[in-house]
Amino acid sequence: NYHDLLVANGGLPVSDGRIPMSDGAGEIDAVGPAVTRWQKGDKVMSLFFPDWQEGRHRPERTRAVTGDSIDGCACEYAVVSENAVTRMPDGLTYAEAATLPCAGLTAWQALMVRGQMQAGDSLLVQGTGGVSIIALQLAKAAGVSVVATTSSNAKGERLKALGADHVINYAEDNDWSDTVKKITAGGVDHVIDIGGGATLQHSINAARTSGQISLVGILGGVTAKVNVPMIFSKQLQVYGVAVGSAAMQEAMIRAVESGQIKPVIDADYDLANIAEAFAYQASAQHFGKITLSI
């Protein structure tokens, strides 16, 4: 996740000796005497916000962040609360399940919880990182038409193979948000915005009247110059989304299972090569997720 890269490169200050990586999946090796939810041998995956079990976001529910304010998953063994994990989706490998707690849940909350996405809706996803790819997969499983953007024609072909209905190369089309409006007859119902400052105005332009924009990233900068009147004249809903609760994760797991969704893994590294994995992530050449195996 981009969050993990920020922890690794000092972009997010953490305590000395903090174990990184917000997401992980594995098998329970032992349980304490008071544990009732799990038993030895259960296959589980982590929660990004272990204290956010259900309900709406509140500050006290998101102070504990795995791999940030508390130790993360880049280790052979971890001792955690029974509420700090959920079950894994059936049919996935540990590596595939480990891609979901941050990127998958962010996409799920944006589209299904906040966005109330339905079959027949349309969605714009930006780029080929983890959130955008799983959002594309969740949307197609739900019967949604998807427009995807990329700066690479080769990646564009891979997006089409995953089910994208339209692909736009924004490196070749400076007015790509106008192109989105043209091919969707007025704009999309939902936008997953990962670029922040660099893409927000494009997202506003690409959304249809009464459309929804989920701000989930800042890859293009933390500040944006936007046409504010366009937001209220189009009566857009613009909201920030940061991962989600345990209850949301359980719902996402059921959707992954019913849709037979297989997360896209670009590369897998041994834990000992974590620095190499981060360097590859920073190069922005990946398609989907990068995982570590132990």
Question: PLM features: residue spans?
Answer:
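Adenosine-nucleotide cofactor-binding segment
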Residues: 122-128, 140-202
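Hydrophobic/small residue at the entry helix of a nucleotide-binding pocket
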Residues: 106, 131, 199
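NAD(P)H dinucleotide-binding glycine-rich loop of Rossmann-like/cofactor-binding domains
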Residues: 48-126
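C-terminal hydrophobic helical "lid"/dimerization subdomain
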Residues: 201, 246-294
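Rossmann-fold dehydrogenase core element
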Residues: 209-216, 225-267
